[in-house]
Amino acid sequence: MVDHLANTEINSQRIAAVESCFGASGQPLALPGRVLLGEGVLTKECRKKAKPRIFFLFNDILVYGSIVLNKRKYRSQHIIPLEEVTLELLPETLQAKNRWMIKTAKKSFVVSAASATERQEWISHIEECVRRQLRATGRPPSTEHAAPWIPDKATDICMRCTQTRFSALTRRHHCRKCGFVVCAECSRQRFLLPRLSPKPVRVCSLCYRELAAQQRQEEAEEQGAGSPGQPAHLARPICGASSGDDDDSDEDKEGSRDGDWPSSVEFYASGVAWSAFHS
């Protein structure tokens, strides 16, 4: 699946085309041995609503971004190392089909494909690349995953106090630990979660109490064992109001429809959704 494409001219051209579409805002993607295996538009469930996003599957990373002009210009590039990825198949509902969750320690989110066949293609290709990466790096599969954010539209009231009703003046916030939609009063605290951010992040009141209790227990065990504790400025949870940490960098403009693609690639299409896998 990978070896015969590595270091070929066609693979280099494909990767260069991706770099060109992201332009100066994106990171360089060409590396010796890196292969572009698949690409396509999937629907990503963002904070406010589901939006089309461009995805590129390499043998060692998964790249996605916002669509400015389909197959011409992308932005908000995100790069996920595949050894950190775990997939979870989601059940079908009348309103939501062909969905699965991409889980990592830093961020987890839900995507959907245009058909069950396309979803299975993406899942099988990603899982095979993850297996190869884990074998190559000798790392065990990832077991810690960030909670996905519950979409804003899922609730009109705070999911913690169940009293505050959201409006144009009463905004929604998200707990970085559990992903719940909460009001400002129920998410006044911050806590340092190193796997998510080097800075303390907003958490809801329940998660704050649980995290603080867990931290106190760990500190007591360390003191009982006679081991030096973590420096206070790193170990202590940070309290206070949060205001500027709720932005979702994926909340960008939607893209246009597709143009023409070579007939030699395996292709799925429905509306703005499409996927192609190289072999």
From Swiss-Prot:
Binding annotation for Zn(2+) 2: 175, 178, 204, 207
Keywords: Apoptosis, Cytoplasm, Lysosome, Metal-binding, Nucleus, Zinc, Zinc-finger
Domain PH, residue spans: 35-131
Pfam families recorded: FYVE (PF01363), PH (PF00169)
Biased composition (Acidic residues): 244-253
InterPro entries found in the cross-reference section: PH-like_dom_sf, PH_domain, PH_domain-containing_F, PH_Phafin, PKHF1_FYVE, Znf_FYVE, Znf_FYVE-rel, Znf_FYVE_PHD
Cell compartment(s), UniProt: Nucleus; Cytoplasm, Perinuclear region; Lysosome
Region (Disordered): 218-264
Main location class: nucleus
GO terms, molecular function: phosphatidylinositol binding; phosphatidylinositol-3-phosphate binding; phosphatidylinositol-4-phosphate binding; phosphatidylinositol-5-phosphate binding; zinc ion binding
PROSITE patterns xrefs: PH_DOMAIN, ZF_FYVE
Gene Ontology CC entries for this record: early endosome; endosome membrane; lysosomal membrane; lysosome; nucleus; perinuclear region of cytoplasm
UniProt keyword Metal-binding present: yes
Listed SUPFAM superfamilies: FYVE/PHD zinc finger, PH domain-like
Zinc finger (FYVE-type): 152-212
Binding site for Zn(2+) 1: 158, 161, 183, 186
Tissues where this protein is expressed: Highly expressed in heart and skeletal muscle. Weakly expressed in brain, thymus, spleen, kidney, liver, small intestine, placenta and lung.
GO biological process: apoptotic process; endosome organization; endosome to lysosome transport; positive regulation of autophagy; protein localization to plasma membrane; vesicle organization
Functional note: May induce apoptosis through the lysosomal-mitochondrial pathway. Translocates to the lysosome initiating the permeabilization of lysosomal membrane (LMP) and resulting in the release of CTSD and CTSL to the cytoplasm. Triggers the caspase-independent apoptosis by altering mitochondrial membrane permeabilization (MMP) resulting in the release of PDCD8.
Free-text comment about domains: PH and FYVE-type zinc finger domains are required for lysosomal location.
Protein's name according to its UniProt entry: Pleckstrin homology domain-containing family F member 1
Organism: Homo sapiens (Human)
